[in-house]
Structure formats: C-alpha cells, structure tokens
Amino acid sequence: MDKKNVMRIETEDKHDISQQKHASLNVQSGRKEEAPSHRQLAGPPAIIIFISLLVACTLLSFTLGRYPVALKELLAILGNKIFGLFKNSEKFWTDQMEAAVWNVRLPRVILSVLVGACLSAAGASYQGVFQNPMASPDILGASAGAGFGAALAIFLDFKHVNITLCAFAMSLLTVALVFRISRYVKGGKVLGLVLAGIMVSSLFNAGTSFLKLVADPNNKLPQITYWLMGSLAGAKWSDIRFVVFPMLAGLIPLLLLRWRLNVITMGDEEAKAMGVDAGRIRIAVIISATLVTASAVSVSGVIGWVGLVIPHMMRRIVGSSYRWLMPVSMLGGGIFLLMVDNISRNVTTAGIPIGILTAFVGAPFFLLLITGRGERY
C-alpha cells in the first residue's frame, strides 16, 4: 500500500473518531444525540445509482417538450451528429426534430447538469471549509457580483456573450475584493471572510437595485429581472464552450482535495497533527469553489438553494465523509437541476424561472432544518 492510500485511510479513520468525539461531547453537555432514523448507502453503490439516474433523467429530458421526440429518433439523431451514423441511409426524422434536439435541448441539458453539479459541489465545499451547515455558494458574494455584472451589461445593451463574460468577471472580482477586505477584519480568517462577504454582497446588491431603478422599464428592466431569477432558456453551445474549462478547473481540484476536506472539518489542530496545512487547503478549496460558482451563475443567472439543499440531502444518503459526499453531491445536483428545468420548460409556454422552483423546494427544507426536526450535521 503506497503512502497516498495510507494517508486517505488515516483521514477517514480520524474523521470517524472526530464524529465519535462530537457525539460524546453532546452527551456530556446534556444534548440528546439521536441515532439516524435511516440507513445510509455505501459510497460505490450510491455513485452507481446516481449515475444511472442521471442517464435516465437525461434521456427523459430529451423526449419532453412541446415538440415530441421518441427515444429511437433521439438516439438516431445523436448518433448521426456525434458519430456520423446513418449518413448513407435515408433519415427517418425531420430537420425540425434534429434542430430541436441538437441546437436547443442538448445544450440546455448539458448546461443544467453542469450548473447543478457546480453549485452542489461549491455548497458542500463551503460547508466543510467554514464548518457551517448553512453555508451556500453565495456566501462570499459570487452571486451578488455576477448579478451586478450581468445587470450592468444589460443596462449598457451588451450582447448575450458579453453579458455572460461580465457576470463571470464581476463574480471573480467580487470574491477577490472579499479576500482583500477580510485581511483587515479583526478575528479569525474564516470569520473575516464571512463578514466581508456579507458586506460586499450587500454593496453589490444595492448596485443592482440602483441599475434596476434607472433602467428602461419597457426593455432593460424586465431583462435584468428575468436574469436575476435564473433561467437556462437561452442555453447555447457558446455558453458551454465559455464555462466548461473554468468549471473543470474548479471541479477537479475539489474532487482531488475531498480527503483533505475531512481533515479540515476536524479543526486546524487536528489537521496540523496530521501534517496538513489547513490554511493552504482552505484557500485552494475556496478558490476552486468560487471558480465553479462564478462559472455557473454567469450562464444560468442566480439560482438559489441548490448548493444548500443538495449537500444536506446527500449527507443523509452517504454520510458526511467528503470521500463520497463530494462526487455524489455533484451527481445529485446535476439530476436535481435537470429535473427542475424539465418542469420549468414544460409547465407553461413561456417557462418558469428556475430560481422560483428551486426556492419552492429549498425553503421548506430550510424550515425543516431550523425547526430542529431535520438531522443536524
């Protein structure tokens, strides 16, 4: 067994010991520690199940819509476009059907999965780094910055691609400003980041409100409002090409650092005893989570609750170890947002903004947590 595997095993063992200590402290302090009322799945079976669900939901998403597409026709169109099949044979599908699948539904499905995976991964990462179960992807102001950038671009009458670019750039600049301000905040580094994030978010939200106030009420204001509610209705291949590399650049480090996240959740002293530089790992995780959040929000608008709700749901399924929690959260987030988007585009002709639908799910779950009837993490 090599050194890397030994390190991973020690991390998992230490994480279990830390959870036992936490339970013991709860008993000593008089708090009642109840055993989980459900049975958790092992990591590998859970991943297999969620991958299967993702494939099934993806195929289902292609067949749903005002222009019906059968599974046989769907597979034929994808095979023809991707692998060049059926080129020498007569098509049994129409050009309109091919355009609907390839130019409209496929970009939207891919973007739904990517955005859901990114928001869930970012939420799980922030909850571990800040050791706060209520942490979400917008804790450092990434969403507020992206909203201001998009509103400014719409106000200045920029094109679709430039709106996405402005939202992405402003999101990263906002978090950079939060890091800068946090250096001057008295207290710990984590507390400084959270307080600076609250202040900067409030500042950029005020800027967005001002732009809405002075925007043209007949043209610009509805466009800004709709963007801020979150939607994937205008998903294009250019959006995917723009965000796929930043998303991968953030998701891959989060997957590679998920064992170290277990160490960070034990506290800095435990991490130092195990030879882990908690400060550097924390910064690396925050930067990666911010990158995927900025990428997701820049193409989808502000979609709340996904990064808060999905990690908690996945903890009930696979436990709190980031070895399995991180990949399962990514899969669960992709499935969740994909199904919500299916509802969004099929309930009404115009489509319901995704942010509204995710709030209908997230708000009751949040209520369950704060009333103490849900499982505490």
Show the residue positions of the predicted features.
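Alpha-helical transmembrane segments in inner-membrane proteins
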Residues: 2-377
